[in-house]
């Protein structure tokens, strides 16, 4: 099938965000084309999903495919932040509840989503990279004279080249973020979360929680020196993904002091700093069977996640340290809001200016909530046994994890799933943890700023929060609009219509 010369919507990128957006749009009968640079199936990291994935998949009729595929079922996750007992976030609070998620091999799960976009009616092409985007002045647009994207040039792996015109553009191009980095130039890095990641795949690892109700769930453990954390994620191909996320500056210092000479040796040396996970790697049975992979893990965000006739989705706009497995959630939730806002604009539910701003604000809110909880967890990890997330004298973090549960499980971003007050409480709690109020203005029992960890990083944390405050809003209602999630009528509606 030849790549068409014109489409109503062009989606750049066939990962979870792009494929989800394309599926939702195509199911509305909207002419949608997806151009993906890689050839599917392709490798990707980010293998643990959160509870919100289920309602998102159900909305595009993809949930049953995932249920029946054979991925490792994820009923929750355990987090060890210091020497206190680990916290556990339970996806299944009621017996028999259909709220579990999965650990996935991304080459397989992403391929399912990419193929589903085609089944839904989108025209999908892999091995085709978008090389440039053309913009033009839109005389009908009064939004600060922002130019409108109208066409894209592409090059296929087989050497073919061409261009495609479109009415709307969804940029789901991953960390490359072609529109954010090349045209809007609005990406900002968060130096406080400037990390590096290294990981590999093991066979024969002992499951976490053997003989307990949480047996086999993913486990995330802080390194003893507070320099980072380790993930332990069992997969259905009989391997366990084990990765180390470490502050880049501290990682560089450690390498200079280390006597190891290879990335594999440094990975194994660093892994020893996670004592709980190390105990799951019995040297007589557990074997590292892959090469060590590496990636920069720098968190970033954008000042806006779109412009007239443009929507930015997933890693193309923002990325957060993956401690709470937020990547796929932010991608698919952004993919849905891109589809909702484009459908609304096409159907005349609201002006295009209101539609793109609704999408952009929603992405900023979802990113902001996850950023706050990740900052809080990072602060606790670096603080060691000093209380940050919990109160002085408290054992464990159960109370804190119950408060932030709507955010770390993603359900705060599923319309109608969580009371607004619960989301507000999670955000307020996380804000107070990251940047405590002055003495006498916070609840007693929580550690004060003067006693908190990372005093040398307070300026950097403040910079991150100031950047967040410019975009974050406490409500997901923007421009007086909210999503209308009805197949055949996807779009936006006035809050007064609810």
UniProtKB/Swiss-Prot annotation:
Keywords: FAD, Flavoprotein, Monooxygenase, Oxidoreductase. InterPro entries: FAD-bd, FAD/NAD-bd_sf, Flavin-dep_Halogenase_NPB. Induction: Expression is positively regulated by the cluster-specific transcription factor otaR1. Expression is also modulated by a second regulator, otaR2, which is adjacent to the biosynthetic gene cluster. Stilbenes such as resveratrol, piceatannol and pterostilbene downregulate the expression of the ochratoxin cluster. Belongs to the flavin-dependent halogenase family. Stilbenes such as resveratrol, piceatannol and pterostilbene affect the expression of the OTA cluster to reduce ochratoxin A and B production and thus could be used as naturally safe and efficient compounds in food active packaging or preservatives against ochratoxin A in food. Pterostilbene with methoxy groups demonstrated greater inhibitory and antitoxic activity than resveratrol and piceatannol. One of its GO terms (molecular function) is catalytic activity. One of its GO terms (biological process) is ochratoxin A biosynthetic process. It is an enzyme of class 1 (oxidoreductase). The keyword Amino-acid biosynthesis does not apply. FAD binds at residues 14, 17, 47, 328. Pathway: Mycotoxin biosynthesis. Disruption phenotype: Completely eliminates the production of ochratoxin A and leads to a significant increase of ochratoxin B. Its EC number is 1.14.14.-. Disulfide bonds: none annotated. It comes from Aspergillus carbonarius (strain ITEM 5010). Flavin-dependent halogenase; part of the gene cluster that mediates the biosynthesis of ochratoxin A (OTA), a mycotoxin composed of a chlorinated type I polyketide dihydroisocoumarin moiety linked to L-phenylalanine, and demonstrated to have nephrotoxic, immunotoxic, genotoxic, neurotoxic, and teratogenic properties. The gene is otaD. The lineage of its organism: Eukaryota, Fungi, Dikarya, Ascomycota, Pezizomycotina. Chloride binds at residues 326-327. This is Flavin-dependent halogenase otaD. It catalyses: ochratoxin B + FADH2 + chloride + O2 = ochratoxin A + FAD + 2 H2O.
């Amino acid at each position: 099938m030849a790549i068409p010369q014109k489409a109503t919507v062009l989606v750049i990128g066939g990962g979870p965000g792009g494929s989800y957006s394309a599926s939702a749009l195509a199911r509305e009968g909207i002419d949608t084309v997806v151009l993906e640079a890689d050839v599917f199936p392709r490798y990707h990291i980010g293998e643990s999903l959160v509870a919100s994935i289920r309602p998102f998949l159900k909305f595009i009729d993809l949930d049953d495919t995932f249920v029946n595929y054979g991925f490792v079922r994820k009923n929750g996750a355990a987090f060890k932040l210091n020497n206190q007992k680990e916290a556990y976030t339970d996806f299944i609070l009621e017996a028999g509840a259909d709220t579990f998620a999965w650990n996935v091999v991304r080459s397989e799960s992403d391929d399912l989503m990419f193929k589903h976009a085609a089944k839904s009616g989108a025209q999908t092409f892999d091995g085709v990279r978008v090389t440039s985007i053309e913009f033009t002045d839109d005389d009908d647009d009064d939004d600060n004279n922002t130019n409108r994207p109208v066409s894209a040039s592409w090059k296929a792996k087989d050497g073919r080249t061409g261009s495609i015109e479109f009415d709307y553009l969804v940029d789901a191009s991953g960390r490359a973020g072609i529109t954010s980095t090349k045209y809007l130039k609005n990406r900002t890095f968060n130096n406080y979360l400037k990390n590096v990641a290294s990981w590999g795949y093991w066979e024969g690892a002992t499951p976490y929680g053997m003989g307990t109700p949480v047996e086999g769930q993913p486990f995330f453990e802080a390194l003893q020196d507070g320099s980072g954390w380790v993930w332990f994620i069992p997969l259905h191909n009989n391997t366990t993904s084990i990765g180390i996320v470490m502050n880049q500056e501290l990682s560089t210092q450690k390498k200079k002091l280390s006597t190891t000479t290879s990335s594999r040796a440094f990975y194994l040396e660093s892994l020893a700093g996670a004592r709980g996970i190390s105990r799951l790697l019995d040297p007589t049975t557990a074997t590292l069977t892959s090469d060590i992979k590496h990636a920069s893990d720098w968190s970033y965000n954008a000042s806006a996640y779109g412009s007239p006739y443009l929507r930015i989705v997933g890693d193309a706009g923002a990325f957060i340290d993956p401690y709470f497995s937020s990547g796929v959630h932010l991608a698919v939730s952004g993919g849905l809001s891109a589809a909702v806002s484009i459908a609304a604009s096409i159907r005349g539910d609201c002006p295009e200016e209101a539609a793109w701003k609704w999408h952009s604000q929603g992405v900023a809110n979802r990113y902001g909530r996850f950023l706050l909880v990740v900052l809080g967890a990072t602060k606790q990890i670096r603080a060691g046994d000093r209380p940050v997330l919990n109160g002085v004298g408290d054992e464990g973090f159960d109370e804190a994890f119950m408060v932030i549960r709507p955010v770390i499980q993603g359900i705060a971003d599923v319309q109608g799933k969580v009371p607004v007050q619960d989301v507000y409480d999670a955000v307020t709690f996380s804000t107070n943890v990251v940047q405590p109020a002055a003495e006498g203005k916070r609840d007693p029992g929580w550690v004060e700023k003067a006693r908190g960890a990372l005093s040398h990083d307070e300026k950097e944390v403040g910079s991150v929060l100031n950047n967040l405050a410019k975009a974050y809003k406490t409500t997901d209602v923007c421009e007086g609009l909210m999503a209308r999630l009805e197949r055949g009528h996807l779009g936006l509606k006035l809050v007064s219509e609810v």
